[in-house]
Every structure is written in C-alpha cells, then in structure tokens.
Amino acid sequence: MEKQIYSYEESFKESLHYFKGDELAARVWVNKYAVKDSFGNIYEKSPEDMHWRIANEVARVESKYPNALTAKELYDLLDHFKYIVPQGSPMTGIGNDYQVASLSNCFVIGVDGAADSYGAIIKIDEEQVQLMKRRGGVGHDLSHIRPKGSPVKNSALTSTGLVPFMERYSNSTREVAQDGRRGALMLSVSIKHPDSEAFIDAKMTEGKVTGANVSVKLDDAFMQAAVDEKPYVQQYPIDSAQPTFTKEIDASTLWKKIVHNAWKSAEPGVLFWDTIIRESVPDCYADLGYRTVSTNPCGEIPLCPYDSCRLLAINLYSYVVNPFKPDAYFDFDLFQKHVALAQRIMDDIIDLELEKIERIMTKIDEDPENEEVKHAERALWEKIYKKSGQGRRTGVGITAEGDMLAALGLRYGTEEATEFSEKVHKTVALGAYRSSVEMAKERGAFEIYNSEREQNNPFIQRLAAADPKLYEDMKKYGRRNIACLTIAPTGTTSLMTQTTSGIEPVFLPVYKRRRKVNPNDTNVHVDFVDETGDAFEEYIVFHHKFVTWMEANGYDPARRYTQEEIDELVAKSPYYKATSNDVDWLMKVKMQGRIQKWVDHSISVTINLPNDVDEDLVNRLYVEAWKSGCKGCTVYRDGSRSGVLISTKSDKDKKEGLPPCKPPTVVEVRPRILEADVVRFQNNKEKWVAFVGLLDGHPYEIFTGLQDDDEGILLPKSVTCGRIIKNVDEDGTKRYDFQFENKRGYKTTIEGLSEKFNKEYWNYAKLISGVLRYRMPIEQVIKLVGSLQLNSESINTWKNGVERALKKYIQDGTEAKGKKCPNCGNETLVYQEGCLICTTCGASRCG
C-alpha cells in the first residue's frame, strides 16, 4: 500500500495542534524527526505517527522474547513524550526504511595500544567520516601519536606531533557536515602525553580545530601535583613501563593554562580519567576489548574502540503528582516500573540496531565499487556489529530534572534538592540493573559476563550494598547489558517534552521575543522600531512549566504583565535563584558528583557562569568536580564563545546611541607578500578552493575557483595556509603566486593564480578584493556579493563559494541583520564559526 505524503504545511499544522500551539516544538519535530525520503517527501503528520512507528517496531522485537510488551503498551509510554523518550537517532531511525543509517547516537573509534603510524592515523580519519555520514557523533583519542620531534622511519625523519592531526580530523568533520550530513567530533589526549600543552592551546588560535570539541584526560597524580604545586612527569608511550621519552613539568603551570583556556573559550573540557576507569564496569573486561579510550562528543558515554551507544530519556517531571501544589509528591512506584521498561526498550533497540547495521553492510556489498575500495567501511561496521551484540551497551537517562525539583517545591542547588535528586538516580540505577538481570533470565546475559571480574568494581559494590538480593541474582543469572546508564544533554528532546534539559536547571523561566508587525493592523502594539523603520511587537515567553506553576497558583498566563510584575512572579516561584546563571555553582558540581555515583557511564553537564567571573572560580569548580567524584566537567562563561549562548537580559546601564567610531586602517600599497589561508568547500558536487590573502589577520584579497578544472591546482589536502606573493614578469605583467611549506619544511610555489582560474571569476575577484582592501565589514561584503545579479549558473555558483569562504572571517557573535531564523522566525541569527546560529531556538545552518 502506498504511503500518504504530507506537505510541510499539513505536517506543521497538525504538529502545532499536537504541541498545543508551541511553534518551536512543532517546527523542530517536522524538520528533524518526521520520516522523510531522499526527495524531502514527509510521511508523518504528527508525533503521534512517529510514536506508533516506534511502538510497532519495538513490539516486533518484543514478540521474540517471553512476556512481550504490546505496541499499545509501548505507545502509551511514548505518547506526547510523557514518560519515555528515545533520543535523536533512535527517534528518527526506528522503523524508517527511507534511511540507511545507524540508530546509534555516538561512537568511539581508535586503537587500543601502540599504533602511531601514518597508516593508523589515516585509517582513523576514514572511519570517522564513514560514521558521520550515517548520523553518528564520533570520539577518538590522540594519545597514541608520537610527540613532536620524535624520530620516525620515513622521509620526514621527525614526527609533527598532535596538532596537525587535530586539524586534519577537524577538517574532515567540517567537510562531512555539509549537504544535510552530520558531523560531531570529540578529540581527547592524556595529560601525560608530552604534546598535551600544544593540544590544550590548539583551539586558542582563531579558526583552528573548529570542527571538534577537545577534552584533556587528567589522572589523579596530575591533579594532586597541580593542587600541591609539585612537578609531574610526562612520557611517551603514556602507559609504558619503559617509555622512550620523558619530560618533567610544573603541574600547576599547565593546570593554570587549562583553567585559563576554559575560562576564555569554554575548552578544553576536563575528563577525570582515573575516576572514569576506576568506576567503569565495562573496563572489568578491558583485556577482551572493552578498555575505555575516549568519550563521545558530548562526553556522557566513555567508550572502548568500535563501541557505540543509543540514548533514551525518562521524563522525570511526569512522575510528580499535583505539581507545584503543597501536596505534590513523586510517584516512585510508577517510576520504578517505568525504569524497568525503559531498560527493556533499550535492549530491544539494540536488536533493531543490529538489523540496521546488517542493512548498512548489505548496501556496502551492493555498491558498485570494487572490494578494495569498500573494504575499510565494511570492516568498520563488522567491528561495531560485534561490539554492539557482544556487550549490548545501553544509555538510559533522564530529562526534566530542573522542572521535577521545582514542581516538588525544591530549589535547584540546595542540599534538600540534591538529596532528593540522589534518591531518584539511585532508583534509576537499581531499577535498570534489576531489569537487566531479569532480561538475562529471559533472553540470556551478554556473552562475556563474568561476576568475578566485576566483584571489586566500586559501582557494582555500591549496587550490592544498596540491594544485596539484586547482586546475588546478578551473580546467579548474569546481566543482559554490560553497562546501562548515562545522562546526556537533551536539547531538542527537551523541546519535545517542553521541559528543562537533562539534569540542568531552567535557563530562564521568562524571556522576551520580538515579532515583526504591521503598525496599521488592528490590535497591534508597537514596542520597538529598528533602524530600517520596521516595527516590532515584544511579547513575553514563559517556560512551559512556569506556566503550570502560574496556573496552579492562581495567575493568568494570558494576561499582559509589566516587567516589574514578572520579576515579582519569578521571585515567588520555585525557579527563583534556580536558573543556570544564578544557581550555586559549587553546589551544582557537588550535586553532579553525588548523582554520578549512581550512573555507570557519565553525565554531560555544563556549568554556566556570568561573564564577569574570574579564573579562580573556574579553578575551584574543576578541583571540586575532581574531589566530588565527577567524571568530567565543562564550564561556559557567558560571552566567552560569542553567539552560542546569549542571555536575553540587556545591560540596563548601557546608554543608547552610536559607539565611538574611528575609520579603518587602509593600506594603499599592497605588500609584496601576504599571509594566506586556504579554504576548501563543495558546491553541489564541484570542489572549490579559495586563497584568502590576509593583512593583520583581516581578509585583504581573495582568489576563488574550481579545484579540479582542466588546469587543476596540485595542492595537498593538508595545506591550510601559506603566502600569496605578488611578482612581476619580464614583460611587466603582474602575477600572484601561492607558496606553501610541506611537512618537511620545503617550499612549493604555484605560479600565476590568475591563470589557474576562470577569467570571469578572476575579474569579479579583483572587484571584491578592492572592497576588502578598504576594510568594508566582512558581513557587508558578503551581503554585497550575495546581491550581485549574475547571469550564468557557473558564476552564481562561484558567487556562493566566495560567500562561504568569507563567512569564516566574520567575528563570532556578529548579528546577521535582516535575516530570519527558518525554524522559529525570529531575527536573532548570529555568525559562529562561519555558520548562522539562532540564539532563540538554537537552530543552525552552515554554508
């Protein structure tokens, strides 16, 4: 039977009704989760269709096992995102026959042991790209790469160290994250590695390693040495009893650099590696291939090479009975029942994932390329298939912790709230592990289970002390899953549940949005007129559960409130002093540590700080996180990475008016030699390259064209910068040459850039370079290029390429004036790393 196709408008309208008027939730669902084919046809009208799709597929798996859940029972758990919410890839992919993609949210790849050859490095690069094209986020560790200056037995003679390969992997991520594909990357390194300082500094250079998150793995010895201001020995190989290279450093100096960089740019994140390994249940099987080497991009799942994880969240708010009322309570009986079912559903999803991987491998087999070309991708998925089936790792987590606490009248960050949260997460741990043991009785334990291997693991010992019967049954019957739990960020998931995200507090209970209006329309209230004369109406947006609090306490959400009245309302609510920017940060870190005791994987959480905090606070937070038993920690200081998170609250003391202005410095005579960046990109299926000449770090000229036209430019992919040299031929003709250094330091010159590119492209490039020379703001240059009325299709493609190349140089946080977010309709787009990001809804678009 032919499936019905819905228009975007039909699906959005029905979803808007489903979400009770929440436009953002409706648009995000249609854009991200509704089933679509490769032509963009939509086959689901609302989340109701999606939930039946998921329920029917999980029920099909259930039917293979005893005590099977029915599709209706499963649907009731999923309906309206009330209780159990598969996250991301499972929500999109389960029952979706239009995609050949994995159901896993994240993967770790790499080598377990010494493998620092160029071949191993290239192999990881290819595997990273192959996973990203199937929707996967990827993490891998660089500690196996030789430090800079080490002797190597090839033509280079010495190793380049970590940083060039960071850039390589980052560029691969940015390359694959085009044309609708996804790319998310985590790079990690041990602090014990002699190049770890260079790794920590790599992202401090603007425009470098922009396609990866970076985290440094800190051992207890380093942390203690940093606190005590004592020396610390780095070595390579990092785990060798007989290292080939050692270096003694001052631990506190390197620690201060980590703190400074995190304060300034939110990276690196820190991973407390000894805690991770000590607490890791899978590492009881390290010698069988389950040695943890890195984490996924968000940090909530430490993994061994070629393992993966699927995520699911339990909506904590839904277990609060009589929310925001004096008699509110948490229904632990229903919660325990649903935790067991969530673990069961996650195990079913592993079976569905194995089917998906089989389909991926079948597609690879059927692809027309020869076996040599396909071998690496096929071998990659074979390894992932084996690990997924052998360990059956799951990622059961939660969302709406902040709303749950508020609904119970508890203020996030207080001792009372933390104590209750710890009780909830202890319940999750015991319930999920009990469910895994029960499934081992019915379905069989994961194949390498061995109770003796796990008997000294601190997490297992904690479970045994809390529930001796569970531990005895586990030893007797085994366990279905090697590890079960995590707490992931639930960004778009929380839009669907209309709650706070993960274990985070509410960002803001009340904020303002602007909507453009026609001042001549009836019932329109003009609050703001911009510099172009457009009129806007400002309206208050309440956090969904803040509205529930208002209704429970006799306040009308539909009424128009003054700012003073809103401030009074917030002060009366349980959200007062409990937002992400004003919770007690040290208490939040301690809360994370206490919850971590009951999570076998890790917790992804960010400590949001105001812009004016000093570096010492970041230092204290990181040290407290280590001492509290956290497995990792990330801080974000407001404005430190402009444009990612921007508070809607304006500075009341800021005076209106134009800022002081001085004319830009104009260099009339071009220096003979300019530093230059090489920017590669793809338009449709054509590969393009741009050479951007820089003066004082600002674009001064640009040469752009096809990389693989008839003339061709023989430029290694590793080349990202060089110099543009202006020369004069014997006949007086001026020409521009590009010179770069290879990895051995030898210079290569490509002569006559003007002859390498299409003449028409060259003439337009001269025009744009003239504008750049006189320091027109980059965003205005892009606007100018975009407005050019050009006739031929090829020159319009070139025009798009120039825009993409120049976007890299827009300062992060620059407003994209006059542009509307396609997701939420607000004019709140800013540039971040060359992409447009909406500060209202978080939607992003690159290219």
Go through each PLM region and give its residues:
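Conserved, charged catalytic cores of large soluble enzymes
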Residues: 2-68, 154-168, 178-290, 321-326, ...
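Catalytic alpha/beta core of large soluble enzyme barrels
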Residues: 23, 299-301, 353-354, 358, ...
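Function-dense linear segments that define catalytic or interfacial modules
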Residues: 57-63, 77-154, 162-165, 176-179, ...
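Internal maturation/activation junctions in enzymes
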Residues: 75, 235-238, 338-385, 389, ...
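Terminal amphipathic helices with adjacent charged low-complexity linkers/tails
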Residues: 218, 284-286, 296, 302, ...
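Short, Gly/Pro- and small/polar-rich lid/capping loops
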Residues: 471-473, 647-694
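Short, cysteine/histidine-rich loop/knuckle motifs that typically chelate Zn2+
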Residues: 822-826, 840
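Cysteine-rich micro-motifs
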Residues: 834-844
